[in-house]
């Protein structure tokens, strides 16, 4: 990979790390057992996990078998370093400093993130699961939604599950937005993404509807009505994001920066409500 390709890659992976940490911190604010070691462990494990999952996904582009993907992934010295420090530092730290709930949810998030990168044999041909309609988007939505539960640990706050559902829907929307600039690539690669199947315009209409309905999770329980404002602010941010994509679907400002910024807005709103004593 040359220098010109390295720069956008590291920028993109940095955005993913920042967005994932924003969701971890959103859940951590609800955690009843906040310690600096737990905080640092969550940061290290999440950052390493994001690099591993998304780089392994890049290695699956040619419908290689899962073992072939692993071999290709490990040929990169940076990947070797990330895996080594994950085994030597992250796993022991997670085992000793994370509660069972956080450890389990973090493992599930990692497995879901890897799930859509796996290739299976269908009719004698290797088929990447991410090529199947919506499999990738649902996996990403659930995996990132689980990050909230990872941060929260064994907390049983009534706001936690609605927040998990809300984040999962919003990240699902975001994953489809990231597919918008790749319609031609998906066509060539046989990936059945939503924009490829429905087209950009209809896909955006579906996403607008999902965005509008996503905040309903905060009004199911009357005791959580205060959180509706949180949901509406995020929904408005996403509405602006989708409008930008409607006019410039291939512009990375809308499909990457503003899109991933949704996770930061979620954290900001959770933090404000936390400081106000509502959480």
Residue ranges of predicted features:
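Intramembrane alpha-helical segments
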Residues: 71-155
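Short, Lys/Arg-rich, polar N-terminal cytosolic tail immediately upstream
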Residues: 1-8, 123
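Membrane-embedded alpha-helical segments that form the functional core of polytopic membrane enzymes
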Residues: 23-56, 103-111, 156-177
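The first (N-terminal) embedded transmembrane alpha-helix
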Residues: 7-29, 141-147
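Solvent-exposed interhelical
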Residues: 45-96, 169-215
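Select subsegments of transmembrane alpha-helices in polytopic membrane proteins
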Residues: 10-17, 76-86, 134-142, 201-208, ...
């Amino acid at each position: 990979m040359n220098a010109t390709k390295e720069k956008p890659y590291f920028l993109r992976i940095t955005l993913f790390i920042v967005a994932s940490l924003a969701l971890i911190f959103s859940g951590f604010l609800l955690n009843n057992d906040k310690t600096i070691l737990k905080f640092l462990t969550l940061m290290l494990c999440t950052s390493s996990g994001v690099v591993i999952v998304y780089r392994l996904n890049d290695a699956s582009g040619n419908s290689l078998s899962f073992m072939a993907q692993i071999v290709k992934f490990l040929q990169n010295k940076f990947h070797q370093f990330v895996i080594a420090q994950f085994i030597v530092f992250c796993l022991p730290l997670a085992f000793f400093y994370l509660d069972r709930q956080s450890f389990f949810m973090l493992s599930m998030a990692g497995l879901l993130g890897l799930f859509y990168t796996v290739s299976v044999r269908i009719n004698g041909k290797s088929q990447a699961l991410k090529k199947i309609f919506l499999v990738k988007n649902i996996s990403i939505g659930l995996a990132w939604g689980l990050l909230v539960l990872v941060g929260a640990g064994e907390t049983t706050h009534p706001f936690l599950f609605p927040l998990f559902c809300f984040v999962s829907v919003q990240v699902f929307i975001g994953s489809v937005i990231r597919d918008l600039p790749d319609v031609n690539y998906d066509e060539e690669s046989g990936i059945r993404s939503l924009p490829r199947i429905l087209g950009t315009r209809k896909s955006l209409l579906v996403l607008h509807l999902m965005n509008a309905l996503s905040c309903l999770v905060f009004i199911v329980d009357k005791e959580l009505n205060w959180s509706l404002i949180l949901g509406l602010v995020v929904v408005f941010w996403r509405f602006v994001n989708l409008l930008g994509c409607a006019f410039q679907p291939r512009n990375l400002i809308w499909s990457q920066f503003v899109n991933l910024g949704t996770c930061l807005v979620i954290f900001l709103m959770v933090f404000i409500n936390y400081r106000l004593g509502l959480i």
